[in-house]
Amino acid sequence: MNSGPGPVGGRPGGRGGPAVQQNIPSNLLQDHENQRLFELLGRKCWTLATTVVQLYLALPPGAEHWTMEHCGAVCFVKDNPQKSYFIRLYGLQAGRLLWEQELYSQLVYLTPTPFFHTFAGDDCQVGLNFADESEAQAFRALVQEKIQKRNQRQSGERRQLPPPPAPINEERRGGLPPVPPHPGGDHGGPSGGPLSLGLVTVDIQNPDITSSRYRGLPAPGPGPTDKKRSGKKKISKADIGAPSGFKHVSHVGWDPQNGFDVNNLDPDLRSLFSRAGISEAQLTDAETSKLIYDFIEDQGGLEAVRQEMRRQEPLPPPPPPCRGGGGGGGGGGGGGGGGGGQPLRPPVVGSNKGRSGPLPPVPMGGAPPPPTPRGPPPPGRGGPPPPPPPATGRSGPPPPPLPGAGGPPAPPPPPPPPPPPPCPGSGPAPPPLPPTPVSGGSPAPGGGRGALLDQIRQGIQLNKTPGALENSVQQPPAQQSEGLVGALMHVMQKRSRVIHSSDEGEDQTGEDEEDDEWDD
Protein backbone atom coordinates (compact mmCIF):
# COMPACT_ATOMS: atom_id res chain seq x y z
CA MET A 1 0.00 0.00 0.00
CA ASN A 2 1.00 3.59 0.41
CA SER A 3 4.37 4.32 1.91
CA GLY A 4 2.57 6.34 4.58
CA PRO A 5 0.42 4.87 7.37
CA GLY A 6 -1.59 1.78 6.48
CA PRO A 7 -5.04 2.45 5.05
CA VAL A 8 -7.81 2.25 7.57
CA GLY A 9 -11.45 3.16 6.93
CA GLY A 10 -12.83 6.46 8.15
CA ARG A 11 -11.81 10.09 8.29
CA PRO A 12 -8.99 11.80 10.20
CA GLY A 13 -9.41 11.74 13.97
CA GLY A 14 -9.30 14.65 16.40
CA ARG A 15 -6.27 16.46 17.75
CA GLY A 16 -3.74 13.98 19.06
CA GLY A 17 -5.74 10.98 17.81
CA PRO A 18 -4.39 8.33 15.45
CA ALA A 19 -4.51 9.03 11.72
CA VAL A 20 -7.33 7.01 10.18
CA GLN A 21 -7.33 7.50 6.44
CA GLN A 22 -7.45 5.28 3.39
CA ASN A 23 -6.63 5.64 -0.28
CA ILE A 24 -9.62 5.48 -2.60
CA PRO A 25 -8.96 3.22 -5.63
CA SER A 26 -10.42 3.45 -9.12
CA ASN A 27 -12.75 0.76 -10.43
CA LEU A 28 -11.18 1.17 -13.87
CA LEU A 29 -7.77 0.01 -12.64
CA GLN A 30 -6.73 -3.45 -11.57
CA ASP A 31 -5.64 -4.14 -8.01
CA HIS A 32 -1.94 -4.13 -8.78
CA GLU A 33 -2.34 -0.86 -10.74
CA ASN A 34 -4.09 0.82 -7.82
CA GLN A 35 -1.37 -0.52 -5.54
CA ARG A 36 1.33 0.92 -7.79
CA LEU A 37 -0.46 4.27 -7.90
CA PHE A 38 -0.67 4.49 -4.10
CA GLU A 39 3.09 3.93 -3.89
CA LEU A 40 3.66 6.91 -6.21
CA LEU A 41 1.74 9.30 -3.94
CA GLY A 42 4.53 9.78 -1.44
CA ARG A 43 4.83 9.89 2.32
CA LYS A 44 1.65 10.88 4.22
CA CYS A 45 -0.21 11.67 1.01
CA TRP A 46 -3.64 10.19 0.45
CA THR A 47 -5.83 10.07 -2.63
CA LEU A 48 -9.44 10.92 -1.81
CA ALA A 49 -10.64 10.23 -5.38
CA THR A 50 -8.97 8.30 -8.20
CA THR A 51 -9.96 7.81 -11.84
CA VAL A 52 -8.63 7.76 -15.42
CA VAL A 53 -8.48 10.92 -17.55
CA GLN A 54 -6.96 12.66 -20.52
CA LEU A 55 -5.36 16.00 -19.65
CA TYR A 56 -6.13 18.86 -22.06
CA LEU A 57 -4.59 22.35 -21.96
CA ALA A 58 -5.71 25.52 -23.78
CA LEU A 59 -2.23 26.81 -24.50
CA PRO A 60 -1.40 30.47 -25.16
CA PRO A 61 -1.20 32.77 -27.05
CA GLY A 62 -4.75 32.43 -28.35
CA ALA A 63 -6.00 29.48 -26.26
CA GLU A 64 -8.33 28.69 -29.14
CA HIS A 65 -8.02 24.91 -29.06
CA TRP A 66 -7.56 22.13 -26.57
CA THR A 67 -4.27 20.25 -26.77
CA MET A 68 -4.06 16.80 -25.21
CA GLU A 69 -0.88 16.66 -23.14
CA HIS A 70 -1.06 13.47 -21.06
CA CYS A 71 -3.16 10.41 -20.39
CA GLY A 72 -3.06 8.71 -16.99
CA ALA A 73 -4.58 8.26 -13.54
CA VAL A 74 -5.70 11.44 -11.80
CA CYS A 75 -5.83 11.68 -7.99
CA PHE A 76 -7.30 14.31 -5.69
CA VAL A 77 -4.49 14.22 -3.15
CA LYS A 78 -4.46 15.37 0.46
CA ASP A 79 -0.81 16.29 1.00
CA ASN A 80 -0.24 16.38 4.76
CA PRO A 81 3.42 17.55 4.68
CA GLN A 82 2.42 20.58 2.56
CA LYS A 83 -0.97 20.98 4.28
CA SER A 84 -2.73 21.46 0.97
CA TYR A 85 -4.79 19.65 -1.65
CA PHE A 86 -3.58 18.85 -5.17
CA ILE A 87 -4.99 17.48 -8.42
CA ARG A 88 -2.16 15.21 -9.59
CA LEU A 89 -1.84 13.14 -12.75
CA TYR A 90 0.37 10.03 -12.68
CA GLY A 91 1.66 7.86 -15.51
CA LEU A 92 1.39 4.21 -14.54
CA GLN A 93 3.68 3.06 -17.34
CA ALA A 94 6.30 5.71 -16.62
CA GLY A 95 5.82 5.35 -12.86
CA ARG A 96 6.04 9.09 -12.15
CA LEU A 97 4.10 12.31 -11.62
CA LEU A 98 3.15 13.90 -14.96
CA TRP A 99 1.31 17.08 -13.88
CA GLU A 100 -0.18 18.74 -10.81
CA GLN A 101 -2.31 21.73 -9.81
CA GLU A 102 -2.62 22.95 -6.23
CA LEU A 103 -6.13 23.80 -5.06
CA TYR A 104 -6.52 27.54 -4.45
CA SER A 105 -9.45 29.27 -2.78
CA GLN A 106 -10.81 31.15 -5.81
CA LEU A 107 -10.67 28.15 -8.16
CA VAL A 108 -13.89 27.79 -10.19
CA TYR A 109 -14.44 24.14 -11.11
CA LEU A 110 -16.76 23.95 -14.13
CA THR A 111 -18.47 20.89 -15.62
CA PRO A 112 -19.63 21.68 -19.19
CA THR A 113 -20.51 17.98 -19.55
CA PRO A 114 -20.61 15.12 -17.03
CA PHE A 115 -17.38 13.68 -18.46
CA PHE A 116 -15.40 16.89 -19.18
CA HIS A 117 -14.40 19.25 -16.34
CA THR A 118 -12.37 22.43 -16.63
CA PHE A 119 -10.79 25.13 -14.45
CA ALA A 120 -8.14 27.84 -14.60
CA GLY A 121 -4.68 26.48 -13.83
CA ASP A 122 -1.53 28.38 -12.93
CA ASP A 123 -0.52 28.91 -16.56
CA CYS A 124 -3.59 28.23 -18.73
CA GLN A 125 -7.07 26.74 -18.82
CA VAL A 126 -7.10 23.02 -17.91
CA GLY A 127 -9.52 20.32 -19.06
CA LEU A 128 -9.98 16.80 -17.66
CA ASN A 129 -11.66 14.27 -19.98
CA PHE A 130 -12.88 11.44 -17.72
CA ALA A 131 -13.24 7.81 -18.76
CA ASP A 132 -16.05 7.12 -16.27
CA GLU A 133 -18.84 9.57 -15.49
CA SER A 134 -19.67 8.19 -12.05
CA GLU A 135 -16.07 8.56 -10.90
CA ALA A 136 -16.00 12.01 -12.53
CA GLN A 137 -19.01 13.02 -10.44
CA ALA A 138 -17.37 11.83 -7.22
CA PHE A 139 -14.16 13.67 -8.15
CA ARG A 140 -16.06 16.93 -8.79
CA ALA A 141 -17.99 16.67 -5.51
CA LEU A 142 -14.80 16.35 -3.45
CA VAL A 143 -13.03 19.23 -5.20
CA GLN A 144 -15.99 21.59 -4.80
CA GLU A 145 -16.43 20.59 -1.16
CA LYS A 146 -12.85 21.55 -0.31
CA ILE A 147 -13.09 24.82 -2.26
CA GLN A 148 -16.29 25.75 -0.42
CA LYS A 149 -14.78 25.05 3.01
CA ARG A 150 -11.70 27.12 2.26
CA ASN A 151 -13.80 30.03 0.97
CA GLN A 152 -15.99 29.96 4.08
CA ARG A 153 -12.97 30.03 6.36
CA GLN A 154 -11.36 32.93 4.51
CA SER A 155 -14.59 34.92 4.17
CA GLY A 156 -14.84 34.99 7.97
CA GLU A 157 -11.37 36.52 8.19
CA ARG A 158 -12.01 39.09 5.47
CA ARG A 159 -15.11 40.49 7.18
CA GLN A 160 -12.84 42.18 9.69
CA LEU A 161 -10.74 43.92 7.03
CA PRO A 162 -11.51 47.53 5.92
CA PRO A 163 -13.11 47.98 2.49
CA PRO A 164 -10.76 48.57 -0.44
CA PRO A 165 -10.16 52.17 -1.56
CA ALA A 166 -12.42 53.74 -4.16
CA PRO A 167 -11.33 53.14 -7.76
CA ILE A 168 -9.54 56.24 -9.01
CA ASN A 169 -8.04 56.62 -12.46
CA GLU A 170 -4.56 57.10 -11.04
CA GLU A 171 -4.90 53.89 -9.04
CA ARG A 172 -5.91 51.65 -11.92
CA ARG A 173 -4.20 48.31 -11.98
CA GLY A 174 -1.42 48.32 -14.55
CA GLY A 175 -1.55 44.60 -15.37
CA LEU A 176 -4.70 44.59 -17.54
CA PRO A 177 -4.14 43.36 -21.08
CA PRO A 178 -4.54 45.81 -23.97
CA VAL A 179 -7.93 45.41 -25.61
CA PRO A 180 -9.16 47.53 -28.57
CA PRO A 181 -11.45 50.30 -27.29
CA HIS A 182 -15.16 49.88 -27.74
CA PRO A 183 -17.08 53.09 -28.52
CA GLY A 184 -19.75 53.83 -25.95
CA GLY A 185 -23.24 55.05 -26.80
CA ASP A 186 -25.34 57.70 -25.14
CA HIS A 187 -28.30 55.49 -24.36
CA GLY A 188 -28.26 53.47 -21.20
CA GLY A 189 -29.41 53.73 -17.63
CA PRO A 190 -30.82 56.66 -15.72
CA SER A 191 -29.25 60.04 -16.29
CA GLY A 192 -28.57 62.66 -13.72
CA GLY A 193 -28.19 62.06 -10.01
CA PRO A 194 -24.94 62.03 -8.04
CA LEU A 195 -21.94 60.50 -9.72
CA SER A 196 -21.12 57.50 -7.50
CA LEU A 197 -18.67 54.64 -7.71
CA GLY A 198 -21.26 52.43 -9.39
CA LEU A 199 -21.69 54.63 -12.48
CA VAL A 200 -20.02 54.43 -15.86
CA THR A 201 -19.63 57.81 -17.58
CA VAL A 202 -19.70 58.70 -21.25
CA ASP A 203 -18.71 62.24 -22.26
CA ILE A 204 -21.07 64.20 -24.51
CA GLN A 205 -19.05 66.57 -26.63
CA ASN A 206 -20.44 70.13 -26.85
CA PRO A 207 -18.10 72.79 -28.26
CA ASP A 208 -20.50 75.63 -27.37
CA ILE A 209 -20.37 75.25 -23.60
CA THR A 210 -18.41 77.53 -21.34
CA SER A 211 -15.74 76.58 -18.84
CA SER A 212 -18.24 76.05 -16.01
CA ARG A 213 -18.08 72.53 -14.62
CA TYR A 214 -21.47 72.12 -12.99
CA ARG A 215 -24.93 72.90 -14.16
CA GLY A 216 -26.68 75.70 -12.35
CA LEU A 217 -23.56 77.23 -10.77
CA PRO A 218 -22.14 80.65 -11.76
CA ALA A 219 -19.03 80.81 -13.86
CA PRO A 220 -15.91 81.62 -11.85
CA GLY A 221 -15.13 85.33 -11.74
CA PRO A 222 -13.08 87.79 -9.70
CA GLY A 223 -13.78 87.67 -5.97
CA PRO A 224 -15.90 90.43 -4.43
CA THR A 225 -14.12 93.24 -2.65
CA ASP A 226 -17.00 94.30 -0.44
CA LYS A 227 -17.79 91.63 2.15
CA LYS A 228 -21.08 93.25 3.18
CA ARG A 229 -22.52 93.36 -0.33
CA SER A 230 -21.19 89.99 -1.37
CA GLY A 231 -23.23 88.16 1.23
CA LYS A 232 -26.62 89.12 -0.30
CA LYS A 233 -25.68 89.46 -3.95
CA LYS A 234 -28.39 88.26 -6.32
CA ILE A 235 -27.54 86.01 -9.23
CA SER A 236 -28.72 87.20 -12.63
CA LYS A 237 -29.10 85.29 -15.88
CA ALA A 238 -25.81 86.72 -17.10
CA ASP A 239 -24.00 85.04 -14.23
CA ILE A 240 -25.27 81.59 -15.18
CA GLY A 241 -23.18 79.82 -17.79
CA ALA A 242 -24.11 77.00 -20.12
CA PRO A 243 -23.95 73.47 -18.74
CA SER A 244 -20.54 71.85 -18.79
CA GLY A 245 -19.21 68.47 -17.80
CA PHE A 246 -22.61 66.95 -18.54
CA LYS A 247 -22.36 63.18 -18.64
CA HIS A 248 -24.70 60.31 -19.47
CA VAL A 249 -24.40 57.49 -16.96
CA SER A 250 -25.30 53.80 -16.92
CA HIS A 251 -25.40 51.74 -13.74
CA VAL A 252 -23.39 48.52 -13.45
CA GLY A 253 -24.58 47.57 -9.95
CA TRP A 254 -21.27 47.63 -8.04
CA ASP A 255 -20.14 49.17 -4.78
CA PRO A 256 -16.73 48.85 -3.11
CA GLN A 257 -17.97 47.04 0.00
CA ASN A 258 -20.40 44.42 -1.29
CA GLY A 259 -19.18 43.97 -4.87
CA PHE A 260 -21.73 43.39 -7.64
CA ASP A 261 -25.44 43.07 -6.91
CA VAL A 262 -25.92 39.60 -8.37
CA ASN A 263 -29.72 39.84 -8.02
CA ASN A 264 -30.00 42.98 -10.19
CA LEU A 265 -27.26 42.50 -12.77
CA ASP A 266 -27.71 43.89 -16.26
CA PRO A 267 -28.48 40.95 -18.62
CA ASP A 268 -25.49 41.79 -20.81
CA LEU A 269 -23.18 41.90 -17.80
CA ARG A 270 -24.58 38.59 -16.58
CA SER A 271 -23.94 37.08 -20.02
CA LEU A 272 -20.36 38.41 -20.02
CA PHE A 273 -19.64 36.98 -16.56
CA SER A 274 -21.22 33.66 -17.52
CA ARG A 275 -19.11 33.35 -20.67
CA ALA A 276 -15.94 34.24 -18.78
CA GLY A 277 -16.65 31.62 -16.08
CA ILE A 278 -16.97 34.12 -13.20
CA SER A 279 -18.92 32.83 -10.20
CA GLU A 280 -21.22 34.73 -7.85
CA ALA A 281 -18.65 34.33 -5.08
CA GLN A 282 -16.12 36.25 -7.17
CA LEU A 283 -18.67 38.95 -8.01
CA THR A 284 -19.44 39.54 -4.33
CA ASP A 285 -15.81 39.41 -3.19
CA ALA A 286 -14.61 42.98 -2.58
CA GLU A 287 -11.16 42.72 -4.13
CA THR A 288 -12.08 40.49 -7.07
CA SER A 289 -15.17 42.53 -7.95
CA LYS A 290 -13.11 45.74 -7.91
CA LEU A 291 -10.73 44.19 -10.43
CA ILE A 292 -13.68 43.21 -12.65
CA TYR A 293 -15.23 46.69 -12.28
CA ASP A 294 -11.96 48.38 -13.23
CA PHE A 295 -11.63 46.13 -16.25
CA ILE A 296 -15.15 46.92 -17.51
CA GLU A 297 -14.64 50.66 -17.04
CA ASP A 298 -11.29 50.59 -18.83
CA GLN A 299 -12.82 48.82 -21.83
CA GLY A 300 -15.58 51.37 -22.38
CA GLY A 301 -18.12 50.62 -19.66
CA LEU A 302 -21.52 49.01 -19.87
CA GLU A 303 -22.15 50.19 -23.43
CA ALA A 304 -19.04 48.37 -24.63
CA VAL A 305 -20.29 45.21 -22.91
CA ARG A 306 -23.69 45.59 -24.58
CA GLN A 307 -22.15 46.03 -28.01
CA GLU A 308 -19.93 43.01 -27.46
CA MET A 309 -22.88 40.85 -26.38
CA ARG A 310 -25.00 42.05 -29.32
CA ARG A 311 -22.41 40.66 -31.69
CA GLN A 312 -22.77 37.21 -30.19
CA GLU A 313 -25.54 34.83 -31.09
CA PRO A 314 -27.53 33.14 -28.27
CA LEU A 315 -26.03 29.79 -27.48
CA PRO A 316 -27.92 26.56 -26.71
CA PRO A 317 -27.59 24.85 -23.31
CA PRO A 318 -25.86 21.49 -23.09
CA PRO A 319 -28.09 18.54 -24.03
CA PRO A 320 -28.10 15.30 -22.01
CA PRO A 321 -25.50 12.72 -23.07
CA CYS A 322 -26.68 10.84 -26.13
CA ARG A 323 -26.75 7.09 -25.58
CA GLY A 324 -28.44 6.13 -28.86
CA GLY A 325 -26.54 3.97 -31.32
CA GLY A 326 -25.43 5.49 -34.58
CA GLY A 327 -23.92 4.46 -37.85
CA GLY A 328 -21.44 1.78 -36.96
CA GLY A 329 -23.12 -0.12 -34.16
CA GLY A 330 -24.12 2.16 -31.29
CA GLY A 331 -22.58 2.67 -27.91
CA GLY A 332 -24.67 0.68 -25.43
CA GLY A 333 -27.63 0.91 -23.11
CA GLY A 334 -30.06 3.75 -22.70
CA GLY A 335 -31.87 5.50 -25.54
CA GLY A 336 -30.37 8.82 -26.53
CA GLY A 337 -32.29 12.04 -26.78
CA GLY A 338 -31.06 12.58 -30.34
CA GLY A 339 -32.75 9.50 -31.78
CA GLY A 340 -31.96 7.93 -35.09
CA GLY A 341 -28.24 7.97 -34.44
CA GLN A 342 -28.03 11.78 -34.67
CA PRO A 343 -26.07 13.11 -31.70
CA LEU A 344 -26.89 16.38 -30.04
CA ARG A 345 -24.33 19.14 -29.88
CA PRO A 346 -22.70 19.92 -26.53
CA PRO A 347 -22.56 23.51 -25.30
CA VAL A 348 -20.76 26.19 -27.25
CA VAL A 349 -19.30 28.57 -24.69
CA GLY A 350 -17.16 31.67 -24.82
CA SER A 351 -16.77 34.43 -27.37
CA ASN A 352 -16.17 33.46 -30.98
CA LYS A 353 -13.34 35.91 -30.98
CA GLY A 354 -12.14 35.17 -27.47
CA ARG A 355 -9.73 32.86 -25.83
CA SER A 356 -12.08 29.92 -26.06
CA GLY A 357 -14.19 29.81 -29.19
CA PRO A 358 -16.39 26.88 -30.22
CA LEU A 359 -14.66 24.06 -32.00
CA PRO A 360 -15.93 22.18 -35.06
CA PRO A 361 -16.06 18.39 -34.79
CA VAL A 362 -13.25 16.03 -35.52
CA PRO A 363 -13.69 14.67 -39.09
CA MET A 364 -15.82 11.52 -38.74
CA GLY A 365 -16.68 10.87 -42.40
CA GLY A 366 -20.12 12.50 -42.48
CA ALA A 367 -21.68 15.92 -42.13
CA PRO A 368 -22.98 16.67 -38.62
CA PRO A 369 -26.68 17.42 -38.07
CA PRO A 370 -27.83 20.97 -37.44
CA PRO A 371 -27.85 22.11 -33.81
CA THR A 372 -30.97 21.66 -31.73
CA PRO A 373 -32.21 25.07 -30.47
CA ARG A 374 -32.47 25.13 -26.71
CA GLY A 375 -32.70 28.81 -25.79
CA PRO A 376 -30.16 30.94 -23.95
CA PRO A 377 -27.36 29.35 -21.95
CA PRO A 378 -27.66 28.94 -18.18
CA PRO A 379 -25.71 31.41 -16.02
CA GLY A 380 -22.29 30.51 -14.75
CA ARG A 381 -21.56 28.24 -17.71
CA GLY A 382 -18.90 30.08 -19.72
CA GLY A 383 -15.23 30.49 -20.13
CA PRO A 384 -13.27 27.52 -21.41
CA PRO A 385 -13.42 25.97 -24.88
CA PRO A 386 -15.98 23.18 -25.43
CA PRO A 387 -15.07 19.65 -24.43
CA PRO A 388 -12.94 17.61 -26.82
CA PRO A 389 -14.04 14.22 -28.15
CA PRO A 390 -12.99 10.96 -26.52
CA ALA A 391 -9.74 9.32 -27.51
CA THR A 392 -10.94 7.13 -30.41
CA GLY A 393 -14.01 6.28 -32.47
CA ARG A 394 -17.46 6.33 -30.96
CA SER A 395 -18.88 3.11 -32.44
CA GLY A 396 -18.58 -0.48 -31.35
CA PRO A 397 -19.64 -2.47 -28.31
CA PRO A 398 -18.58 -1.55 -24.75
CA PRO A 399 -15.10 -2.71 -23.77
CA PRO A 400 -14.83 -6.17 -22.18
CA PRO A 401 -13.73 -6.51 -18.54
CA LEU A 402 -10.01 -6.10 -18.01
CA PRO A 403 -8.09 -9.36 -17.48
CA GLY A 404 -7.36 -10.17 -13.87
CA ALA A 405 -9.37 -7.24 -12.56
CA GLY A 406 -11.79 -9.39 -10.58
CA GLY A 407 -14.76 -8.17 -12.61
CA PRO A 408 -14.75 -4.37 -12.17
CA PRO A 409 -17.59 -2.58 -13.98
CA ALA A 410 -16.82 -1.50 -17.51
CA PRO A 411 -16.82 2.24 -18.32
CA PRO A 412 -20.08 3.64 -19.77
CA PRO A 413 -20.61 4.31 -23.47
CA PRO A 414 -19.06 7.47 -24.91
CA PRO A 415 -20.86 10.83 -24.74
CA PRO A 416 -22.05 12.73 -27.84
CA PRO A 417 -19.59 14.16 -30.36
CA PRO A 418 -18.40 17.78 -30.29
CA PRO A 419 -20.43 20.65 -31.78
CA PRO A 420 -20.68 21.51 -35.49
CA PRO A 421 -19.31 24.83 -36.81
CA PRO A 422 -21.19 27.97 -35.69
CA CYS A 423 -23.93 29.46 -37.82
CA PRO A 424 -23.02 32.08 -40.47
CA GLY A 425 -22.98 35.58 -39.13
CA SER A 426 -21.57 34.66 -35.73
CA GLY A 427 -18.01 35.40 -36.73
CA PRO A 428 -15.30 33.34 -38.44
CA ALA A 429 -15.02 29.77 -37.26
CA PRO A 430 -11.92 29.03 -35.15
CA PRO A 431 -9.46 26.34 -36.19
CA PRO A 432 -10.73 22.80 -35.55
CA LEU A 433 -9.54 20.53 -32.79
CA PRO A 434 -6.70 18.37 -34.13
CA PRO A 435 -7.52 14.64 -34.31
CA THR A 436 -6.61 12.75 -31.19
CA PRO A 437 -3.41 10.76 -31.88
CA VAL A 438 -3.75 7.01 -31.55
CA SER A 439 -1.34 4.15 -31.85
CA GLY A 440 -0.35 2.76 -35.23
CA GLY A 441 -1.93 -0.41 -36.59
CA SER A 442 -5.39 -1.69 -35.87
CA PRO A 443 -7.53 0.23 -33.36
CA ALA A 444 -7.87 -1.06 -29.83
CA PRO A 445 -10.97 -3.22 -29.24
CA GLY A 446 -13.82 -1.68 -27.36
CA GLY A 447 -13.46 1.85 -28.80
CA GLY A 448 -14.68 4.96 -26.99
CA ARG A 449 -13.56 5.36 -23.40
CA GLY A 450 -12.25 1.80 -23.14
CA ALA A 451 -9.43 2.78 -25.48
CA LEU A 452 -8.49 5.58 -23.07
CA LEU A 453 -7.75 2.97 -20.42
CA ASP A 454 -5.75 0.91 -22.91
CA GLN A 455 -3.60 3.96 -23.71
CA ILE A 456 -2.58 4.23 -20.09
CA ARG A 457 -1.65 0.56 -19.75
CA GLN A 458 0.24 0.46 -23.04
CA GLY A 459 2.09 3.68 -22.27
CA ILE A 460 1.30 5.38 -25.57
CA GLN A 461 3.33 8.54 -25.98
CA LEU A 462 1.02 11.31 -27.13
CA ASN A 463 2.13 13.86 -29.67
CA LYS A 464 2.97 17.24 -28.24
CA THR A 465 2.51 20.57 -30.00
CA PRO A 466 5.93 22.23 -29.80
CA GLY A 467 4.83 24.85 -32.30
CA ALA A 468 2.27 26.22 -29.90
CA LEU A 469 4.82 26.41 -27.10
CA GLU A 470 7.32 28.19 -29.35
CA ASN A 471 4.71 30.69 -30.47
CA SER A 472 3.89 31.48 -26.86
CA VAL A 473 7.48 32.61 -26.38
CA GLN A 474 7.99 34.37 -29.69
CA GLN A 475 4.67 36.18 -29.98
CA PRO A 476 2.76 38.34 -27.49
CA PRO A 477 -0.74 37.20 -26.52
CA ALA A 478 -3.19 37.87 -29.30
CA GLN A 479 -5.47 40.09 -27.25
CA GLN A 480 -6.48 42.04 -30.37
CA SER A 481 -8.79 39.26 -31.52
CA GLU A 482 -10.02 37.99 -28.20
CA GLY A 483 -12.78 40.44 -27.36
CA LEU A 484 -14.04 41.26 -23.89
CA VAL A 485 -14.73 37.66 -22.87
CA GLY A 486 -11.23 36.41 -23.64
CA ALA A 487 -9.59 39.48 -22.12
CA LEU A 488 -11.64 39.13 -18.93
CA MET A 489 -10.71 35.44 -18.67
CA HIS A 490 -7.06 36.44 -19.01
CA VAL A 491 -7.42 38.99 -16.21
CA MET A 492 -9.11 36.44 -13.94
CA GLN A 493 -6.36 33.89 -14.58
CA LYS A 494 -3.80 36.49 -13.52
CA ARG A 495 -5.90 37.15 -10.44
CA SER A 496 -5.96 33.43 -9.67
CA ARG A 497 -2.17 33.28 -9.73
CA VAL A 498 -1.93 36.28 -7.38
CA ILE A 499 -4.41 34.74 -4.94
CA HIS A 500 -2.64 31.42 -5.20
CA SER A 501 0.68 32.96 -4.18
CA SER A 502 -0.90 35.05 -1.42
CA ASP A 503 -2.72 32.03 0.00
CA GLU A 504 0.62 30.54 0.99
CA GLY A 505 1.10 33.32 3.52
CA GLU A 506 -2.50 33.22 4.70
CA ASP A 507 -2.37 29.48 5.25
CA GLN A 508 0.48 29.96 7.72
CA THR A 509 -1.74 32.18 9.90
CA GLY A 510 -4.57 29.66 9.87
CA GLU A 511 -2.51 26.60 10.73
CA ASP A 512 -3.87 26.41 14.26
CA GLU A 513 -7.44 26.15 12.95
CA GLU A 514 -6.49 23.39 10.49
CA ASP A 515 -4.40 21.23 12.81
CA ASP A 516 -7.24 18.74 13.10
CA GLU A 517 -7.38 18.37 9.32
CA TRP A 518 -3.75 17.44 8.67
CA ASP A 519 -1.73 14.46 9.87
CA ASP A 520 1.62 15.10 11.55
UniProtKB/Swiss-Prot annotation:
Polar residues composition bias: residue spans: 203-213, 471-482
GRSGPLPPXP motif repeat boundaries on the chain: 354-363, 393-402
Major location category of this protein: cytoplasm
Compositionally biased spans, kind Gly residues: 1-17, 323-342
Modified residues (Phosphotyrosine): 293
Every CRIB domain range: 240-253
Comp. bias regions, Acidic residues: 504-520
GO biological process terms on file: actin filament polymerization; actin filament-based movement; actin polymerization or depolymerization; Cdc42 protein signal transduction; cellular response to type II interferon; endosomal transport; negative regulation of cell motility; negative regulation of stress fiber assembly
Region of interest (Disordered), residue spans: 1-23, 148-247, 307-520
Processing after translation: Phosphorylated at Tyr-293 by FYN and HCK, inducing WAS effector activity after TCR engagement. Phosphorylation at Tyr-293 enhances WAS activity in promoting actin polymerization and filopodia formation.
Phosphoserine, modified sites: 501-502
Subcellular location: Cytoplasm, Cytoskeleton; Nucleus
GO cellular-component term (any): vesicle membrane
Domain WH1: 41-150
Record's subunit section: Binds the Arp2/3 complex. Interacts with CDC42, RAC, NCK, HCK, FYN, SRC kinase FGR, BTK, ABL1, PSTPIP1, WIP, and to the p85 subunit of PLC-gamma. Interacts (via C-terminus) with ALDOA. Interacts with NCK1 (via SH3 domains). Interacts with FCHSD2.
Domains: entry comment: The WH1 (Wasp homology 1) domain may bind a Pro-rich ligand.
Name of the protein described by the UniProt record: Actin nucleation-promoting factor WAS
Native organism: Mus musculus (Mouse)
